[in-house]
């Protein structure tokens, strides 16, 4: 029969030893402890204490040792991870934050330009195409201007968005030299072609206003001549914008010839086309149109300042309004010319400067080049804003169909034709809105023989301000229509 073994002391008692000499020991019989047993107990106690200390350090660091690899090896990694989490952001993170804020601001500016240019020019083109009465000579030039600005927004600005999120300094790989070279040529072609068309279209609008106000009525630009001028403008833009450097021998792409450099290059390749081509491009497509704009509006302002009668005989009230509507259109075009020169002037200056210095195209574009290109894009977004400010009836023209409003020649005939949709309160508000601005005109109409219809004529002139989109002249009395020759039609700008 086996003797029952005495109960084993707790682990703490075994590690610390017995306080009495006769106490049982885990290493030997009662009555004393040997040196070997004492050494084993001390070594085990040391290892256990170290392990418990490591576990406590790992738990204080905020992470367990098991996911880091387990045991003693994972505790060091856990302490390092905890320290990394608690480490504050250093000064090296400031450039990253500032770069992100700059990219976000540039993206917002590009988005604003894109929305104004695309939506605004689409609205302008829709107004002209929707209403048959607005398909006139001046509106043909405006349609060309809006089309070029719209194509610039659709084909050039998406590449600028892509450039914002492209790592800086990236160059084209050797395997993609051919496609990359074609992309650079296409980018320059779109930007140059549509910019030239936009500038030439504004010059043609100025020429049309000059012929309408300064020259005799028989010298106005006709439809056939307008189509010829527009065709010449587009062909000139195509001729100067074609990538002629592709016809030469292909050259090695420079390391700095990046996506950013292709997009914001402000001049043709001087190594293949020469500086003379850049100078000729600026002079023929920008400086000469600028001079034509200034010449036309100088004579327009001079004619208006000297005498109204020298432009055409003013013997009816309707002709007075017609003349002032033409002057108002010329004023709007003058505002457009100021913005065109301000937006395209820096670009032309940089092109001439690069041609004079024989700057190489492999140099990265400077900040001035980027700002100059962005200003040319912004010009396409400014023009629709000018239309909307100078003509408060843009929304009315967009919402009105062809048969409404333009079939009649009289405001009083237009108002009842709207039926129950336009109540009496709306009609009175519409009349008061434009009648309050007619102080001088109404005083002049009191001496007019046709004062009975002068109010309707004045209301038509204020309700349909001749800003840009051209249409037929203001309504005249039936008796006056039979006396007036048909060749003296009114201004045809909206």
Swiss-Prot record:
Residues 1-35, 473-494 are annotated as: Disordered. Residues 485-494 have a biased composition (Basic and acidic residues). The chain crosses the membrane at residues 13-33, 38-58, 82-102, 126-146, 165-185, 227-247, 263-283. The keyword Transmembrane applies. Residues 1-10 have a biased composition (Pro residues). Residues 34-37, 103-125, 186-226, 284-494 are cytoplasmic. The keyword Transmembrane helix applies. Keywords: Cell membrane, Endosome, G-protein coupled receptor, Membrane, Receptor, Transducer, Transmembrane, Transmembrane helix. Residues 1-12, 59-81, 147-164, 248-262 are extracellular. GO terms for molecular function: arrestin family protein binding; G protein-coupled receptor activity. It is a multi-pass membrane protein. GO terms for biological process: G protein-coupled receptor signaling pathway. InterPro entries: GPCR_Rhodpsn, GPCR_Rhodpsn_7TM. GO terms for cellular component: endosome; endosome membrane; plasma membrane. Residues 21-35 have a biased composition (Low complexity). Disulfide bonds: none annotated. Interacts with MTNR1B. Interacts with ARRB1 and ARRB2 in a spontaneous and agonist-independent manner; leading to the internalization of GPR135 in the endosomal compartment. Orphan receptor. Has spontaneous activity for beta-arrestin recruitment. Shows a reciprocal regulatory interaction with the melatonin receptor MTNR1B most likely through receptor heteromerization. This is G-protein coupled receptor 135. The gene is GPR135.
